[in-house]
Structures are given as C-alpha cells and as structure tokens.
C-alpha cells in the first residue's frame, strides 16, 4: 500500500520550484563584460593564504644540487613521523605560521589548520619540523640532555633558534642542507608536505638507518636524495654532533654504494675527514631519472617540453 503525501510535502511541492534555484544559481556563473577572463591562466592573488603560485621551479629547487658542503638542519632519532616533519594541527598565534598569517591580516580565529593551507607554500613551509614534540639532537641543555621543541642550531655560529628562523637563515645564505636520522624515518600518514617542506628549506639529502616506503618515494619525487647507513653504522657510532660539513660523492645509480664525506674538527683543533659508505635509496632507474630531473614535476615538465619539440 502507498501512503498519501503529507500536507507539508504537498505544500513544498507547490511552493518550491526548480526555476527558483535556476534563477539564483545560473547567473552566478555568468561572467559579465568586466569579469570576462583576459587570460586562460589563473590570476594568482598575492594576498591569498590558501592558494599561491607554486615555487617548484624557483629558488632552491631551480638551483643545481651540489651535494657538497652541506650543513645538518637536524640530527634525529628513530621513528620520526610525518607529523614531526609537517604537522597538520591547528595553527597557533605564537608559531611561525601564526605570526605570518597575523602579518597577512588574518584574524586568529581564522588561522585554521596547517593542512588547510597546503596550497600556499609560504604558510605550509613554516610547518616544517614545527612539532613541539620534536627532539633535534643538535639542541641540548648544558647537562647534555636533548631539549624538546621546534628548535635548530645554526652553524658555524652554534646559535640555537626556532626551526623556521634557522631555515630562513640558511635560505638567505643559500646553504645546502642535510638531515641525519635513525630508523623508520618518515613513518605515519602520507603527507606530501613532509617531503616538500624539507626540499623548500634547501635539504638536498637525508641519511637515515631506514625509510618508510611511501615517504621515501615522496622524497625522490621532490628531488631529495635518500641515503641509508650500512648495518652497524649510525649517527651514534660516528659521534655526529652537527658541527660537521657533509658531501656525497660517487655514481648515483639504483641502490649503489656512495660515499658520505664528513669533515669535522677534532678536540685539538685539527681537521678530521671520515669517508662513510652509504646505500643510495633510489631503488629503480625510473627513480634515478626523476631525481636527476629535480623531482617528479620537473620530470613531467621536461617530458612535456620534449614532446612539444618533437
């Protein structure tokens, strides 16, 4: 048996007509003479904090990667997650991203989360290592214990500052960077900004005891070279403290053995050079090709331009 329509549904059917919605919504998409697009290209808005012209063909990403004389941005332990690398929580006023948004005229109640600003690199890159739970082994108290927080130590001065200020300092110096880490680097939920952030900071290579699979792939896609310590070798056996300069030499090929050259001063002021064999974690020829192009976007642009010429 079919039930009879209620009085309310009958009234709605008589009062609400499709034409009412068409009258309101269709004109919203009709561009007038003033609004007609002058160009097929998107008109980037300089004040937007949500979508901004990507910088992936500019700055550090446009410069050649030398893999020479790199300074460590951080020396990290085991189980560093993508949330350490690029948190997605709410943006606080006293954070680097919060200060930037405030400067851009955004009220604090509209800061939103880091995740919502992924389309604006000027906001999102300030999330790099912005996790207050981070332990950067380069930042220690006077008793030698590691200080918790989004901190870094800028070398050669040895000055400790907030991570973003350290990144800015190195960016202004055009200083290539490296990250040293323990096992299971990059575990957790997949976040593209966990790789984008370090690359935009100027990180050219990451040496770890092991990588999470998806994050390693994302690093390759951003043109960051993943390197793996040989078994039994790590930041502790090498007694790394962050004052060193790092270079990588050798033929980059799938899982080839490269040499990590570490230069540091000894206690008596003499120079010491260590040559440490590491495994290149570009696992396939395709990954080598993507890395050599500068990343997956650069590789795509390269293939597109070559196709246009052909």
Language-model regions: role of each:
Residues 2, 193, 215:
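Histidine-centered active-site/metal-ligand motif
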Residues 32-207:
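Non-catalytic terminal/interface segments that mediate subunit docking, oligomerization
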């Amino acid at each position: 048996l079919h039930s009879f329509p209620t009085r309310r549904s009958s009234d709605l059917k008589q009062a609400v007509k499709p034409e009412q919605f068409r009258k309101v919504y269709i004109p919203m998409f009709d561009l007038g003479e003033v609004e007609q697009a002058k160009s097929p290209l998107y008109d980037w808005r300089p004040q937007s904090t949500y979508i901004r012209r990507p910088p992936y063909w500019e700055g550090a990403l446009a410069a050649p990667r030398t893999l020479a004389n790199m300074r460590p941005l951080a020396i990290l332990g085991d189980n560093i997650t993508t949330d350490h690398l690029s948190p997605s929580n709410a943006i606080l006023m006293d954070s680097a991203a919060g200060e930037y948004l405030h400067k851009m005229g955004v009220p604090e109640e509209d800061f939103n989360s880091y995740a919502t600003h992924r389309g604006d690199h000027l906001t999102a890159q300030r999330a790099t290592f912005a996790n207050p739970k981070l332990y950067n082994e380069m930042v220690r108290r006077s008793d030698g214990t590691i200080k918790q927080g989004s901190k870094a130590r800028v070398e050669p001065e040895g000055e400790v500052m907030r991570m973003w200020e350290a990144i800015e300092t190195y960016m202004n110096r055009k200083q290539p960077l490296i990250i040293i880490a323990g096992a299971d680097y990059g575990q957790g939920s997949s976040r593209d900004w966990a790789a984008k952030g370090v690359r935009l900071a100027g990180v050219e290579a990451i040496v770890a005891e092991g990588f999470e699979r998806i994050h390693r792939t994302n690093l390759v896609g951003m043109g960051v070279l993943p390197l793996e310590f040989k078994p039994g070798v790590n930041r502790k056996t090498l007694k790394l403290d962050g004052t060193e300069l790092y270079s990588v030499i050798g033929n980059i090929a799938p899982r080839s053995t490269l040499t990590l050259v570490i230069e540091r001063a000894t206690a008596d002021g003499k120079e010491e050079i260590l040559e440490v064999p590491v495994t290149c974690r570009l696992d396939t020829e395709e990954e080598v090709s993507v890395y050599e192009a500068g990343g997956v976007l650069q590789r795509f642009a390269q293939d597109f331009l070559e196709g246009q010429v052909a």
